[in-house]
């Protein structure tokens, strides 16, 4: 969802306008995939060109590189599993302002939870599968009036990172996807192509193909 459009309608999403809790720590929040240094995003939120027919389509989530069998994790405390499919699941988290945040995980190999289960941050929800060797992670904000918005997962994860003091970066082609959601003094410089390749080759995902995913 375009942040400017949301602000024009008086609906905001972010660490200042949509607080998770008064105080948080790493126990209260988690990224959807455990990584020691950074999440490797192969396809971010936004318009992208279809590799098959060349048409441009909106990609409403982000694709996170995974090894087959990597655990996928709940991101917050007190989530409720509201949907489970063969290779997907959705967890819903309430907000103090009456809105709800839904996090959806797709391309799973196994699902460990059932509908109506309550989950806490860091709980294992399932395992990534063989479909493109990536986790498709999307975020939807449901306002108290019932209107719904697809939110850039980078904005949501930036919020999670700040509230939970999570230090891992979220990178796409060497670019810090959190940069536009940080204050200038906290923004990190993007990596040069050589530095990005060096970082990839030394990362946990170095044994996985580096091409983008559909």
Q: Which residues does each predicted region cover?
A:
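Solvent-exposed, flexible loop/coil residues
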Residues: 49, 66-68, 112, 155, ...
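Zn2+-dependent peptidoglycan hydrolase active-site motif and core
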Residues: 57-60, 68, 74-115, 132-141
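Generic alpha-helical secondary structure signal
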Residues: 18, 99, 151-154, 195
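Conserved, short, structured surface segments that act as functional micro-motifs
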Residues: 63, 90-92, 117-182, 190-191
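Amphipathic alpha-helical interaction segments
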Residues: 53, 113, 164-165, 204
């Amino acid at each position: 969802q375009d942040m400017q459009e949301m602000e024009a309608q008086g609906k905001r999403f972010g660490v200042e306008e949509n607080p998770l809790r008064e105080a948080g720590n790493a126990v209260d929040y988690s990224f959807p995939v455990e990584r020691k240094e950074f999440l490797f995003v192969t396809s971010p939120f936004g318009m992208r060109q279809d590799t098959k027919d060349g048409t441009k389509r909106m990609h409403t989530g982000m694709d996170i590189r995974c090894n087959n069998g990597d655990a996928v994790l709940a991101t917050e405390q007190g989530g409720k599993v509201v949907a489970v499919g063969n290779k997907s699941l959705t967890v819903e988290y309430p907000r103090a302002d009456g809105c709800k945040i839904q996090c959806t995980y797709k391309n799973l190999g196994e699902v460990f939870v059932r509908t109506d289960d309550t989950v806490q941050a860091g709980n294992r929800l399932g395992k990534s599968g063989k479909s493109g060797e990536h986790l498709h992670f999307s975020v939807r904000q449901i306002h108290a009036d019932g209107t719904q918005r697809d939110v850039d997962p980078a904005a949501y994860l930036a919020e999670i990172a700040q509230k939970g003091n999570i230090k891992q970066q979220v990178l796409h082609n060497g670019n810090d996807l959190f940069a536009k959601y940080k204050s200038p003094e906290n923004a990190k410089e993007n990596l040069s192509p050589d530095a990005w390749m060096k970082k990839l080759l030394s990362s946990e995902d170095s044994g996985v193909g580096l091409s983008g995913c559909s």
